[in-house]
Protein backbone atom coordinates (compact mmCIF):
# COMPACT_ATOMS: atom_id res chain seq x y z
CA UNK A 1 0.00 0.00 0.00
CA UNK A 2 1.41 3.38 -0.98
CA UNK A 3 1.65 6.03 1.71
CA UNK A 4 -0.71 8.42 -0.10
CA UNK A 5 -3.32 5.64 -0.31
CA UNK A 6 -3.52 5.10 3.45
CA UNK A 7 -6.62 6.64 4.98
CA UNK A 8 -9.57 5.74 7.23
CA UNK A 9 -12.20 3.62 5.48
CA UNK A 10 -15.91 3.68 6.37
CA UNK A 11 -16.88 0.30 7.78
CA UNK A 12 -20.34 0.89 6.37
CA UNK A 13 -18.78 0.68 2.89
CA UNK A 14 -15.89 -1.76 3.37
CA UNK A 15 -14.60 -3.87 6.25
CA UNK A 16 -10.81 -3.81 6.50
CA UNK A 17 -8.82 -6.83 7.59
CA UNK A 18 -6.97 -6.40 10.91
CA UNK A 19 -3.59 -5.85 9.21
CA UNK A 20 -5.02 -2.95 7.19
CA UNK A 21 -6.59 -1.48 10.34
CA UNK A 22 -3.14 -1.42 11.97
CA UNK A 23 -1.63 0.20 8.85
CA UNK A 24 -4.25 2.97 8.92
CA UNK A 25 -4.05 3.36 12.72
CA UNK A 26 -0.25 3.71 12.65
CA UNK A 27 -0.43 6.17 9.75
CA UNK A 28 -3.08 8.36 11.42
CA UNK A 29 -1.58 8.35 14.94
CA UNK A 30 0.81 11.32 14.68
CA UNK A 31 1.10 11.55 18.49
CA UNK A 32 2.11 7.89 18.70
CA UNK A 33 4.64 8.38 15.90
CA UNK A 34 6.18 11.27 17.81
CA UNK A 35 6.45 9.14 20.97
CA UNK A 36 8.37 6.35 19.17
CA UNK A 37 10.51 8.60 16.97
CA UNK A 38 13.80 8.16 18.88
CA UNK A 39 13.44 4.37 19.09
CA UNK A 40 12.53 4.21 15.40
CA UNK A 41 15.60 6.23 14.42
CA UNK A 42 17.84 3.91 16.46
CA UNK A 43 16.27 0.93 14.70
CA UNK A 44 16.58 2.59 11.26
CA UNK A 45 12.85 2.40 10.53
CA UNK A 46 10.21 5.08 10.16
CA UNK A 47 8.19 6.03 13.26
CA UNK A 48 5.08 4.83 11.43
CA UNK A 49 6.62 1.39 10.83
CA UNK A 50 7.80 1.19 14.46
CA UNK A 51 4.32 2.10 15.69
CA UNK A 52 2.73 -0.49 13.38
CA UNK A 53 5.05 -3.21 14.73
CA UNK A 54 4.28 -2.21 18.32
CA UNK A 55 0.53 -2.32 17.64
CA UNK A 56 0.78 -5.83 16.19
CA UNK A 57 2.90 -6.96 19.15
CA UNK A 58 0.53 -5.49 21.74
CA UNK A 59 -2.59 -6.82 20.01
CA UNK A 60 -1.08 -10.33 19.91
CA UNK A 61 -0.86 -10.61 23.72
CA UNK A 62 -3.03 -13.62 24.61
CA UNK A 63 -3.83 -12.18 28.06
CA UNK A 64 -5.83 -9.29 26.58
CA UNK A 65 -9.52 -9.21 25.77
CA UNK A 66 -10.03 -8.32 22.10
CA UNK A 67 -13.15 -6.68 20.66
CA UNK A 68 -13.84 -5.49 17.12
CA UNK A 69 -16.44 -2.91 16.13
CA UNK A 70 -16.48 -1.79 12.50
CA UNK A 71 -12.95 -0.95 11.37
CA UNK A 72 -11.75 -0.45 14.95
CA UNK A 73 -9.95 -3.02 17.09
CA UNK A 74 -9.84 -2.75 20.88
CA UNK A 75 -7.84 -4.52 23.57
CA UNK A 76 -8.58 -4.55 27.28
CA UNK A 77 -6.13 -5.53 30.00
CA UNK A 78 -8.29 -6.69 32.91
CA UNK A 79 -7.56 -5.65 36.50
CA UNK A 80 -9.24 -6.25 39.86
CA UNK A 81 -12.47 -4.43 40.60
CA UNK A 82 -13.90 -4.78 37.07
CA UNK A 83 -11.39 -2.23 35.73
CA UNK A 84 -9.86 -2.44 32.26
CA UNK A 85 -7.02 -0.60 30.54
CA UNK A 86 -7.90 -0.01 26.89
CA UNK A 87 -6.03 0.46 23.62
CA UNK A 88 -7.87 1.16 20.40
CA UNK A 89 -6.62 0.81 16.86
CA UNK A 90 -8.82 2.77 14.48
CA UNK A 91 -9.07 2.44 10.72
CA UNK A 92 -12.59 3.89 10.46
CA UNK A 93 -14.00 7.34 9.73
CA UNK A 94 -14.70 9.64 12.69
CA UNK A 95 -18.53 9.27 12.71
CA UNK A 96 -18.15 5.48 12.58
CA UNK A 97 -15.38 5.58 15.21
CA UNK A 98 -17.81 7.23 17.63
CA UNK A 99 -20.37 4.49 16.94
CA UNK A 100 -17.67 1.79 17.19
CA UNK A 101 -16.58 3.22 20.54
CA UNK A 102 -20.19 3.18 21.73
CA UNK A 103 -20.55 -0.49 20.68
CA UNK A 104 -17.27 -1.25 22.44
CA UNK A 105 -18.43 0.41 25.68
CA UNK A 106 -21.68 -1.59 25.57
CA UNK A 107 -19.75 -4.82 24.92
CA UNK A 108 -17.24 -4.12 27.68
CA UNK A 109 -20.11 -3.56 30.10
CA UNK A 110 -21.74 -6.86 29.08
CA UNK A 111 -18.56 -8.84 29.66
CA UNK A 112 -18.10 -7.38 33.14
CA UNK A 113 -16.13 -4.12 33.03
CA UNK A 114 -17.44 -1.25 35.20
CA UNK A 115 -14.55 1.16 34.55
CA UNK A 116 -12.32 1.58 31.53
CA UNK A 117 -9.15 3.67 31.43
CA UNK A 118 -7.11 4.76 28.41
CA UNK A 119 -4.09 6.96 27.83
CA UNK A 120 -5.08 9.74 25.43
CA UNK A 121 -2.75 12.08 23.58
CA UNK A 122 -5.12 14.19 21.46
CA UNK A 123 -8.02 16.47 22.41
CA UNK A 124 -9.97 15.07 19.43
CA UNK A 125 -9.92 11.61 21.01
CA UNK A 126 -11.28 13.02 24.28
CA UNK A 127 -14.21 14.52 22.33
CA UNK A 128 -14.82 11.21 20.53
CA UNK A 129 -14.82 9.25 23.80
CA UNK A 130 -17.21 11.70 25.44
CA UNK A 131 -19.54 11.53 22.42
CA UNK A 132 -19.51 7.72 22.55
CA UNK A 133 -20.22 7.71 26.30
CA UNK A 134 -23.17 10.09 25.79
CA UNK A 135 -24.73 7.53 23.42
CA UNK A 136 -25.06 5.11 26.32
CA UNK A 137 -28.50 5.72 27.76
CA UNK A 138 -27.51 4.85 31.33
CA UNK A 139 -27.33 7.94 33.61
CA UNK A 140 -24.67 6.15 35.70
CA UNK A 141 -22.19 6.39 32.79
CA UNK A 142 -19.63 9.05 33.70
CA UNK A 143 -16.41 10.25 32.08
CA UNK A 144 -13.33 11.91 33.52
CA UNK A 145 -10.20 13.20 31.78
CA UNK A 146 -7.04 13.78 33.82
CA UNK A 147 -5.17 16.23 31.59
CA UNK A 148 -2.06 16.17 33.78
CA UNK A 149 -1.54 12.45 33.11
CA UNK A 150 -3.52 12.21 29.83
CA UNK A 151 -5.76 9.50 31.26
CA UNK A 152 -9.39 9.14 30.27
CA UNK A 153 -11.74 7.08 32.43
CA UNK A 154 -15.32 6.07 31.75
CA UNK A 155 -17.68 4.20 34.02
CA UNK A 156 -19.81 1.86 31.91
CA UNK A 157 -22.72 2.07 34.34
CA UNK A 158 -23.56 1.47 37.98
CA UNK A 159 -20.81 -0.29 39.96
CA UNK A 160 -21.42 -4.00 40.49
CA UNK A 161 -20.15 -6.12 43.37
Regions found by a protein language model. Give the residues of each.
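Conserved catalytic-core motifs of GNAT/GCN5-like acyltransferases
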Residues: 135-153
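Acyl-donor binding region in acyl/amide transferases
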Residues: 80-137
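Short secondary-structure transition/capping segments
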Residues: 128-130, 150-156
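Short, charged/polar, Gly/Pro-enriched secondary-structure boundary elements
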Residues: 158-161
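Conserved donor-binding loop and adjoining core beta-sheet/short helix segment
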Residues: 59-94, 156
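Short glycine-rich, low-complexity/disordered patches
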Residues: 34-43, 115-121, 142-144
